[in-house]
């Protein structure tokens, strides 16, 4: 993997669908708190949304905080007819260019039961992940095992603290380096066996 390029902006990127129960509004609320404490962060933090349209809570937060220059909605990445690069290849490229990837788990009760497929896409990118999860100790452990930033959905203070840590790490050019552990068959089998033998 080539060395990550730190630039003028701290680019937090979310890929995939958004909804009122899986919204970037919670990240914008944390950004507002960050800017109160570190006003200069306002000139550097950018939140990018790729994929689906913004949910209504995210749109409201943009207006409430005046964040039209902070949250940038790019929509779906489509195939480039000139270069022939597919939308999927563009997504992979944008993931690898991100400073931090935002994994929004949602806050439905069924979130406690599943691991989002986006998590695996993010792992392959090799970029730091900021997981905002909902009552899912297994997902939390998978994130922590791979050196990720972690917050609990609904914990505004904790989310703000995580964003502050990301900001301070970025300023030092020392964002967490994820441990490269894509999940393969071997790991799945050993994990299943460890649960059976307990």
Question: Predicted regions span which residues?
Answer:
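Conserved donor-binding/catalytic core segment of Leloir-type glycosyltransferases
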Residues: 4-22, 28-31
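Short hydrophobic signal-anchor/transmembrane segments that target glycosyltransferases
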Residues: 25-41
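Nucleotide-activated donor-binding/catalytic signature segment of Leloir-type glycosyltransferases, i.e.
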Residues: 38, 42-44, 48-52, 56-92
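Flexible glycine/serine/alanine-rich "lid" or loop that lines and gates the nucleotide-sugar donor pocket
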Residues: 96-97, 124
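A charged, aromatic-enriched C-terminal amphipathic alpha-helix characteristic of glycosyltransferases
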Residues: 153-161, 168-198
């Amino acid at each position: 993997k080539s060395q990550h390029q730190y630039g003028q902006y701290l680019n937090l990127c979310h890929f995939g669908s958004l909804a009122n129960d899986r919204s970037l509004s919670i990240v914008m609320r944390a950004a507002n708190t960050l800017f109160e404490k570190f006003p200069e962060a306002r000139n550097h933090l950018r939140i990018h949304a790729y994929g689906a349209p913004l949910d209504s809570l995210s749109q409201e937060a943009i207006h409430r905080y005046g964040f039209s220059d902070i949250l940038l909605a790019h929509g779906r990445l489509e195939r480039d007819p000139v270069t022939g690069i597919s939308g999927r290849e563009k997504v992979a490229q944008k993931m690898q260019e991100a400073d931090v990837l935002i994994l929004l788990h949602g806050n439905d009760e069924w979130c406690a039961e599943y691991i989002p497929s986006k998590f695996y896409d993010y792992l392959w990118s090799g970029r730091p992940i900021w997981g905002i999860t909902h009552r899912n100790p297994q997902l939390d452990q998978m994130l922590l095992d791979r050196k990720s930033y972690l917050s609990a959905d609904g914990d505004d203070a904790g989310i703000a603290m995580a964003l502050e840590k990301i900001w301070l790490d970025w300023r030092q050019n020392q964002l967490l380096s994820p441990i490269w552990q894509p999940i393969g068959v071997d790991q799945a089998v050993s994990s299943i066996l460890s649960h059976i033998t307990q």
